[in-house]
Amino acid sequence: MISENVKLINSKIIEPVFIDDNVVIENSTIGPHVSIYKDTKILDSHVENSIIGKHTQVLNAQINNSMIGNNCKYDGNYKSINIGDFSELI
């Protein structure tokens, strides 16, 4: 399910996915098996088999089998990672 007010710019979505309200995805590939919660930005990334919390930024990432919490900022190339709420990994 993809919410109506998701902004997709030059990106590919591979179902099944859940993408919540006010998400921006740019120059990225998302899916399969990805959940992205509200007010999150994903730029220049590839995300699969992962959960990304609300109010989070994912930049320049290649992630798989990962969980990123709420209010996080992630800029990196770890392939599998779990990050708690209010974390920064840049």
Predicted features, each with a name:
Residues 1-90:
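Left-handed beta-helix
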